[in-house]
Amino acid sequence: MDRVCWIMALSWFWMVSTGLVSAEEEVLMNTKLETSDLRWTIYPSGDPEWEEMSGLDEEGNSVRTFQVCPMDSSVSHWLRTRFIPRHGASQVYVEIRFTMMECSAMPASFRTCKETFNLYYYQSDEDTASATHPAWMENPYSKVDTVAADFLLRRGGERKSNVKTVRVGPLSKKGFYLAFQTQGACMALLSVRVFFKKCPAVSRAFSSFPETLPHSLVQQAEGVCVDNSAPTGQSTAPPTMFCGEDGQWVGPPSSTCACKPGYEPVDSDRCRACGLGQYKASVGGSLCRVCPDNSNTHFAGSSLCVCRPGYHRATSDLPDSACTKPPSAPRSIIYQINDTVVTLEWSEPLDRGGRSDLSYSVECMHCRGSLCVQCADSITYRPGQMGVPGRRVIIRGLLPHTTYTFTVLAQNGVSAVSHTSPASSSVNITTSRDVAVPVSGIRRIKASESSVSISWTVPPQTQHSIQDYQLRYSLKGQDDGWQYVSSRSSSVVLNDLSRASQYQVQVRARTAAGYGHFSSAVSISTLPDDEESPSRLMLTGVLVAIGLLILIAVVIVAVFCFRRSTRRRDPDPDKSGQFLMGQGIKVYIDPFTYEDPNEAVREFAKEIDVSFVKIEEVIGAGEFGEVCRGRLKVPGKKENYVAIKTLKGGYTDKQRRDFLSEASIMGQFQHPNIIHLEGVITASCPVMILTEYMENGALDSFLRLNDGQFTPIQLVGMLRGIASGMKYLSEMSFVHRDLAARNILVNSNLVCKVSDFGLSRFLTENSSDPTYTSSLGGKIPIRWTAPEAIAFRKFTSASDVWSYGIVMWEVMSFGERPYWDMSNQDVINAIEQDYRLPPPPECPASLHQLMLDCWQKERSSRPRFCAIVSALDRLIRNPASLKITGRIPDGPSHPLLDQRAPPPLSHCSSVADWLRAIKMERYEDAFMQAGFTAIQHITHISTEDLLRIGVTLAGHQKKILSSVQTLRIHGGSLRY
């Protein structure tokens, strides 16, 4: 009983929260449904007080009723029902509707009036009751309850009936009788309904439970798993659930049933077959999944997707993996004969079959006439004959002057189960000792931005004439990307090359004896470059010399006049914005130094026919007009996407000159991390500037859109690209002045390129990038600008380095706004007080230290861009250093870092003070654990000690050892 009560208590909350399935009632007797006399037994029968009558119920239906109003209250008056079969119920409910007269409303003769009656029951296996049996008394009858009225009738009052429901039981025999006994009550029995409650059939938790009669407080019912489900785990016990005595299911079921493979759960009570094109591989509550690529199902309720014809799964593939197919044949087999050694090379199949486990096998056939047999076992293959992962095999041990057929087969993981022969390509080779002499004298005849004309010296042949030549070329440094061209003459034209790029070229000759060796690689570049053809070298030298003399004279006169006119109002030569040309170095030329700015446009930007351009959509707006995406199709060249800046109508000459100045600037730069100028359109309206199209847009918005999606090494790669572009600009003596993440563009390969050179001279103010107006005029983006540029408009490459440090912070914070919501004046004040931005979350300590180096107050102390590129390269080569992050203060926001000068080393009284003084406090715990707990221990530390402690960065080792040397020199003044 205690266990049952515990189950009931435990299930109470579950019943309330999940809702109850209504109990089902089975009626054993209902007098309201009787249409004839009830023929109940009345006692005493000689002078019966109970009287059967016809009446109307509350709905106006005719019903049979009994009423009694005895004058003598000393006599008991009984009324007994007919035999009622119990139908297996262990207890029943009796619903009684009756009225009762109030005793005070009765005449005085009813002095012993009562306002209650008693209900009894008697059990029997047969209908044996009579007028005298059983005896009309409490025993053998069992008393159920004394029933009192809630509403009493009085003369002239409201007529209201009473409804009472009582429970009768326990019942054990086939049926029972109900008996009503009154003694002095004046009442009417309007209706009697006898029923019992049972738990209805229900499905829960993928288990089906039958209709259940409760025989006790709770009755355990056994169920079965619903259709298309089965028990999970090792248990085979059927599901169970408890049925309460009130006909309600109690608590959740105990069930391990779950949907079978090929079926998914629906509403937690049934399993539905997976549709065509879907599958489910295991028993459980997971949903059906779409079939992997190249597979399908043939019927609903599938547990596995079958591969489409021609596709297979390897024995090592998982059952739910995509189906793949064997690869297509290898392409372009190239061979080289050296005596009796053959080297085979080939290109990758066009179709890898959807797999990465591609390998190759080489078959050799020895042919004499029309008869071919397998090659001898003495032939060797390097690196192997079967399952070769690469695309090059060297075959040794061949016979001279013999014809061989070599077949290269492409295979992958499903080739063995495909029951088809691997795709292959074959080549016939005849060995000979009389091979062609190597080619020499390779030279460039003519070059353009996308093509090169090459010729070479015809090699002398002693026995066989040269049939043709084979040339191979690739970008310099990419030895695995060779492309091949054949030529019958000693020259060839290579097209579709990258501009301003260096290529390595090799040539070999073929005779009747086969191909000779490739020549040594020769480096040849496309335009623009600084080379001149030999035929024009002398003329070019003379013209250059004359031009330099004239230019030097003009520059001297211009500088003299300029300094004379500006000496009083501008004593600092850096403020003029002019850039002097270096010795033998290509430098930037300011287009505003031209008397006619249009001449600068013609010199540095290529004019493009407007018919070559197709504008597709507007992607933004700039200072001068709209920015669009379009296509550029120059005849003879591949169509490319371009970004198009347009000059809005109604412009002034100055606006047109300022708009095109950016093209004059951009056209001077050729670098993979500088936005590339395709050309300009000035001969028609609107005037346009065309640049390469960068799919991912501005870096700041791209990072915010992909917050947290990139690893530190990827972010460092982006920063390295930006630094490389700025290194190129600084070497060109160009100062950007507005370096920020919003002015860095990102292409589909995550390559970052510096852009927006017009803003280096014309900065506008807007709500997202507020600027500060200096006393000298002009707008400056405060948050990105070095303090000397804010105060004195002193823009140099060092001020660009400061801005680059802010860009680093933007990148590592995924586009966070520098200095958050601080005002411009607060930013200026904080920088003047030597406060700097803290490291972004999860920022490697080495990167934040590089930021702090870029934010040195003295511009001469900041690193150059070449040093920044080298530092980032070291981090990329040592990814482990990016796992060390700085300590970030707790709290809702990160305060600015105090970068004021540390105290002198002589004031350091502990190891912790010393490490903080040299900004190496990150190693404090490591020093303590290694036993360096006092200053006197530090003076004897070595490089080996630092490695043992965990200081692996060369820069940190150098900084610590340098400080240790200082401690040794000033050891006498240290306080221990």
Curated annotation (Swiss-Prot):
Segment forming the signal sequence: 1-23
Catalyses which reaction(s): L-tyrosyl-[protein] + ATP = O-phospho-L-tyrosyl-[protein] + ADP + H(+)
Domain annotation Fibronectin type-III: ranges: 326-434, 438-529
Q: What is the lineage of its organism?
A: Eukaryota, Metazoa, Chordata, Craniata, Vertebrata
List, alphabetically, the GO terms of the cellular component aspect. plasma membrane; receptor complex
Report the SS bond pairs: 69-186, 103-113
Binding-site residues for ATP, renumbered to this chain = 619-627, 645
Q: Taxonomically, which superkingdom? A: Eukaryota
**Membrane topology note:** Single-pass type I membrane protein
Q: What coarse category fits the chief subcellular location reported for this protein?
A: membrane
Which organism's genome codes for this protein?
A: Danio rerio
Where is it localised?
Answer: Cell membrane
InterPro entries xrefs: Eph_TM, Ephrin_rcpt_lig-bd_dom, Ephrin_rcpt_TKs, FN3_dom, FN3_sf, Galactose-bd-like_sf, Ig-like_fold, Kinase-like_dom_sf
Q: What is the top EC class of this enzyme, as a single word?
A: transferase
Residue ranges, Cytoplasmic side: 563-976
What is the designated name of this protein? Ephrin type-B receptor 4b
The family database entries (Gene3D superfamilies) matched by this protein are listed as: ephrin a2 ectodomain (2.60.40.1770), Galactose-binding domain-like (2.60.120.260), Immunoglobulins (2.60.40.10), Phosphorylase Kinase, domain 1 (3.30.200.20), Transcription Factor, Ets-1 (1.10.150.50), Transferase(Phosphotransferase) domain 1 (1.10.510.10), Tumor Necrosis Factor Receptor, subunit A, domain 2 (2.10.50.10)
